[in-house]
């Protein structure tokens, strides 16, 4: 029988909240006896927006805004039923997007 792996991808605009959430997930999985691989920092996505400062003229005067999306990857190897239950009950901040694949 092949071993089961849970892959968790975390995304957030703020890296502090993201690292805190990853630490909570790792601590919960280790407490229940599962093996952990990660958190692995994935490349940061950078989206740049360029906007005219004035509403009608001055094409040379522009302002740039950027949005960074930080990502982390955590693999949980050989999870126990207790691990899955504790991960379901885990309370994480609202600014973190979580994607779980079995």
From Swiss-Prot:
The keyword Nucleotide-binding does not apply. InterPro entries: Ribosomal_uS10 (IPR001848), Ribosomal_uS10_CS (IPR018268), Ribosomal_uS10_dom (IPR027486), Ribosomal_uS10_dom_sf (IPR036838). One of its GO terms (cellular component) is ribonucleoprotein complex. SMART domains: Ribosomal_S10 (SM01403). GO terms for biological process: translation. Disulfide bonds: none annotated. GO terms for molecular function: structural constituent of ribosome; tRNA binding. Keywords: Ribonucleoprotein, Ribosomal protein. Involved in the binding of tRNA to the ribosomes. Part of the 30S ribosomal subunit. Belongs to the universal ribosomal protein uS10 family. This is Small ribosomal subunit protein uS10. It comes from Lactobacillus acidophilus (strain ATCC 700396 / NCK56 / N2 / NCFM). The gene is rpsJ.
């Amino acid at each position: 029988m092949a071993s089961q792996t849970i892959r968790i991808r975390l995304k957030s605009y703020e890296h502090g909240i993201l690292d805190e959430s990853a630490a909570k997930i790792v601590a919960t999985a280790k407490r229940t006896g599962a093996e952990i691989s990660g958190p692995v920092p994935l490349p940061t996505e950078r989206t740049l927006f360029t906007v005219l400062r004035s509403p009608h003229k001055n094409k040379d005067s522009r302002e740039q805004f950027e949005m960074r999306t930080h990502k982390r990857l955590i693999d949980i190897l050989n999870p126990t039923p207790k691990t899955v239950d504790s991960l379901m009950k885990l309370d994480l901040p609202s600014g973190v997007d979580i994607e779980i694949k079995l």
